Amino acid sequence: FKGKLKIIDEQKHLTAINILSLEDYLLSVISSEMRATSSAEFLKAHAVISRSWLLAQIDKAKTVRGTYSSYRVDQDEYIRWYDREDHAHFDVCADDHCQRYQGISKAYTPAVREALEATRGEVLTYEGTICDARFSKCCGGATERFDNTWEPVVHPYLDKITDAPEDLETGDLRNEQTARKWILSFPPAFCHTTDRQILSQVLNDYDQETQHFFRWQVSYPAEQLSELVYRKIGIDFGTIRDIQPIERGVSGRLIRVKITGDKKTLVIGKELIIRKTFSESHLYSSAFIVEKQDGIFTFH
């Protein structure tokens, strides 16, 4: 790691804080999020996006205090959205919660530093403001609106786009039947590739361990699912009997889902809490359908 190391006592734990320049930070980020062997233009684009995101968060922290995650809880709904929660003593953390930052050992090609030098100081802006640039490794063929995923703020530059060479016709993915057809299909999206040469060029080894990231499925017996949901969000539904889509975003991602158990029925959202609720870690996406057969819930 570059820079200086600061150790502080934070709530009876020691916290290590790495103090370094923006560009040294980005040197690690763009080779931790993606691989240092990625093409030059890919690395340049990543540098601009990651620089923009970081500066937007720092600027936001100057004006917004308290938590960056919010709740709306009543007897019928549990709605939560996450963002970069307020790190009181540092700007960003070192994992996917903010951006991956794994030190300079990942930046083992000259192309990484060259990409930073070529884009030094460059950011994305919209109407004079630095963009809150978000990114993912695989969008499943279509991206979602910012306000459907995070806080209810509309950013016109973060809207639905299709990830394809030409405008891929998806239909209205807010419609359940259209979304179902889309989710069960394999459209010709850029991120739909099994080419090992491409994947090994742009993904670090730990990301290549995931084989089925474009379309996937996971199954749970009802008893296991009920225990998992109780453990993840602390709400006792009893035995879960049904999971129903209530609202989907423009990309088909679920924003609100109704869980029906023999003790309780509740609607949960937004996107990330849905993904966390139905997985030990998190589902790859909330663009899924649920099928039930013989007491087994299968998420596609």
Where are these regions (language model features)?
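Conserved, single-site charged/polar hotspot
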Residues: 1-300
